[in-house]
């Protein structure tokens, strides 16, 4: 020990033992381990809080940052001092609870085919708390199973899984694993006894302010309103439905929901006619009708807003309330499937009517009544009553089914979706401010699902994928038995059908880099036509809830900016140039397919080589496929960029992706709207038109079911704020959600 340390020890020992002998003894032990002056100064300052004011150094250093952070975290839960509210219950969120599939065993996959139609026996958040998960949670809480006290069961009784995600990244020597996010309700005293403290990425205290709680004051004050404002909502997709439900449940407004398409029961018949008779109903199809385009799609509920945010949680809980499987609250990449959406939408419709809302199906808005910069309502074309169409009107609230009808309202919400091109054209004529924005176009790529399982999980785990559909599972099992020839490791755990996500911002088109990415990946799905007009062909992907088909499909698209040179030939259409470009490509696809809704296809290997396929593999597209030169359908820069992305990026990200059995289908043009309605960031009203509220994907403020639903809620809150306060300007900021919602690509 050097001289400085010895002197300091002597001084501190005298003072320390006079005030607090145990602390002084601890200080002595630390000082004996280091003689460096800087370390000595920092270590001495650690205990300065136990000294009197006179004994504290005048120029106090900040001390060890890590130690101070720990002290700060402890203060947050009352460690080291008397708790003010020891019985107050707080929610702790635990991240990174890891469990391996083999530990879960074959019971991991829940038999979705045995779920009752009313959703009464779907898995709950509690059902995911299996013994391996509990063991991993106890380890995080630093509680050994054999040391569990009588108080432990009560702690676990309030635990619930809020998210489960599969990490199947193939690292050397690493198996797939599930990571859980678990919430636990604990009193402050219990948290202190366990020594819990917030840690970034591991533990946090939740501030549980959910979106549904923001309407309380409005709902309470709604009874005082004399005449309820009538709010016309155009479009019954996620944005329109959630907006209508929010307005109706508040009791403040009467929502009048107009939908050009049909209720899900009748809409299914229209889709059947398209598949079997190749006849496109321009008002009732895969894109238009109750629930929007997402109804006949995969029903993905992923979003970039953040799965753990209150608004997203509220949307998911609302879907469960109306019949969605409870597992969507937990799974890291949840999806509903078309079969679940039909029941859910029917329940949502019935509830909306019970709350006082109106719904008019077969009602297409054709004119927006704007006077003196303010919208007064809409004119709509209604389905005529005759023997052929009478069945379509059984679910409509319209008492008189004229050919045209005017719906007046105090405000109008536009939630029309990105495929309602006639709406953009009508708004443009009416003087509503529109602005072009970037979008993406490309194809649907389809692989046999067993090959995606192999690429993502490897030979050892690919054979452990089970969908509960015997024919599909047999194909997958035989594929991996042939590959391994008995050499694969034996596993008890099971895995879901594999999916993927690919992206690059360096897709070189010959002159510049573009973005290219996969979009709306549908494992165990099928490809369907999503055209809304005769003489055009565009496609989409969909899956049922079981995801048990033999194929996996995804969009492969490349970006187009609003000032892209490839749009120059369409500039005469002004801000609608992107729409005309989409239409042009869809007409070409229709012609390449033989003008009968057959889809033009090309092997992926032939596409990158610029050659027409001499033969094609089987496809999930039910209207037939024909070999065609898809490499010629888009302008050369887009072909170059996508080919470069496939060969130089996607194949390297997923070795085996570029194979002969991969089949491109044309075309995927409607990933998002090429237009955005200008919207005031504070009032959320359309630029230049009072009381007109654009929302959802069609308005350019969302991308996907969840983000569209959240945006619909945000707009509903802005409307309620305006009519509650009587403020003509309104204020969406009162609800802390006035910004545009992020996209999920």
List the predicted regions and their residue ranges.
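Compositionally biased low-complexity segments, especially N-terminal hydrophobic helices
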Residues: 18, 24, 32, 42, ...
């Amino acid at each position: 020990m050097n001289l400085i340390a010895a002197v300091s020890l002597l001084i501190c020992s005298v003072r320390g033992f006079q005030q607090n002998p145990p602390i002084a003894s601890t200080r002595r032990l630390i000082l004996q381990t280091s003689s460096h002056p800087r370390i000595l100064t920092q270590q001495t300052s650690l205990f300065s809080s136990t000294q009197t004011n006179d004994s504290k150094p005048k120029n106090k250093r900040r001390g060890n940052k890590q130690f101070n952070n720990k002290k700060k975290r402890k203060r947050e839960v009352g460690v080291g001092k008397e708790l003010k509210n020891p019985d107050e219950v707080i929610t702790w969120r635990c991240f990174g609870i890891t469990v391996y599939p083999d530990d879960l065993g074959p019971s991991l996959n829940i038999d979705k085919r045995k779920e009752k139609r009313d959703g009464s026996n779907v898995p709950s958040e509690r059902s995911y708390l299996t013994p391996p998960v509990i063991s991993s949670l106890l380890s995080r809480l630093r509680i050994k199973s054999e040391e569990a006290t009588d108080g432990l069961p009560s702690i676990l009784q309030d635990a619930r899984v809020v998210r489960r995600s599969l990490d199947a990244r193939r690292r050397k020597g690493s198996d797939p694993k599930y990571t859980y996010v678990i919430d636990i309700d604990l009193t402050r005293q219990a948290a202190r006894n366990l020594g819990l403290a917030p840690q970034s990425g591991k533990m946090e205290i939740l501030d549980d302010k959910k979106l549904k709680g923001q309407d309380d004051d409005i709902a309470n004050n709604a009874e005082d309103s004399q005449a309820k404002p009538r709010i016309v909502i155009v479009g019954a997709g996620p944005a329109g439905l959630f907006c209508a439900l929010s307005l109706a449940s508040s009791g403040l407004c009467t929502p009048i929901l107009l939908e050009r398409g049909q209720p899900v029961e009748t809409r299914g018949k229209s889709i059947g006619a398209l598949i079997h008779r190749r006849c496109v109903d321009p008002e009732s199809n895969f894109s238009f009708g109750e629930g929007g385009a997402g109804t006949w799609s995969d029903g993905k509920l992923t979003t970039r807003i953040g799965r753990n945010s209150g608004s997203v949680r509220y949307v998911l809980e609302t879907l469960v309330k109306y019949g969605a499987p409870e597992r969507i609250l937990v799974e890291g990449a949840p999806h509903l499937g078309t079969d679940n959406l039909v029941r859910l939408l029917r329940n949502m419709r019935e509830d909306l009517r019970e709350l006082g809302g109106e719904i008019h199906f077969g009602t297409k808005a054709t004119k927006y009544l704007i006077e003196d910069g303010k919208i007064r309502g809409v004119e709509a074309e209604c389905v005529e009553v005759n023997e052929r169409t009478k069945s379509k009107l059984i679910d409509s609230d319209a008492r008189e089914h004229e050919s045209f009808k005017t719906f007046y309202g105090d405000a109008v919400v536009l939630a029309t979706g990105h495929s309602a091109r006639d709406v953009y054209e009508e708004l443009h004529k009416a003087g509503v401010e529109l602005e072009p924005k970037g979008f993406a176009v490309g194809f649907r790529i389809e692989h046999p699902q067993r090959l995606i399982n192999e690429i993502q999980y490897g030979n050892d785990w690919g054979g452990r994928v089970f969908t509960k559909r015997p024919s599909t599972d047999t194909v997958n099992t035989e594929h991996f038995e042939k590959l391994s020839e008995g050499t694969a490791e034996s596993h008890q755990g099971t895995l879901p059908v594999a999916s993927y996500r690919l992206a690059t911002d360096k897709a070189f088109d010959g002159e510049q880099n573009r973005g290219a990415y996969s979009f709306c990946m549908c494992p165990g799905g099928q490809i369907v036509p999503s055209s809304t007009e005769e003489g055009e062909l565009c496609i989409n992907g969909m899956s049922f809830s079981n995801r048990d088909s033999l194929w996996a499909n995804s969009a492969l698209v490349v970006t187009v900016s609003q000032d892209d040179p490839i749009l120059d030939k369409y500039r005469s259409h002004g801000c609608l140039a992107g729409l005309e470009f989409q239409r042009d490509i869809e007409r070409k696809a229709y012609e390449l397919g033989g003008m009968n809704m057959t889809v033009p296809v090309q092997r992926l290997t032939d596409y990158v080589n610029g050659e027409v396929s001499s033969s094609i593999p089987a496809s999930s597209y039910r209207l037939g496929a024909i070999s065609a030169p898809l490499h010629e359908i888009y302008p050369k820069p887009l072909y170059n960029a996508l080919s470069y992305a496939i060969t130089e990026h996607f194949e390297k990200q997923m070795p085996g992706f570029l194979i002969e059995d991969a089949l491109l289908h044309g075309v995927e043009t409607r990933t998002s709207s090429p237009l955005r309605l200008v919207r005031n960031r504070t009032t959320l009203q359309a630029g230049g038109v009072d009381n007109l509220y654009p929302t959802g994907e069609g308005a350019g403020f969302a991308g996907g079911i969840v983000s569209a639903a959240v945006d619909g809620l945000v707009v509903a809150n802005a409307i309620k704020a305006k009519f509650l306060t009587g403020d003509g300007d309104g204020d969406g900021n009162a609800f802390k959600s006035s910004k545009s919602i992020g996209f999920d690509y």
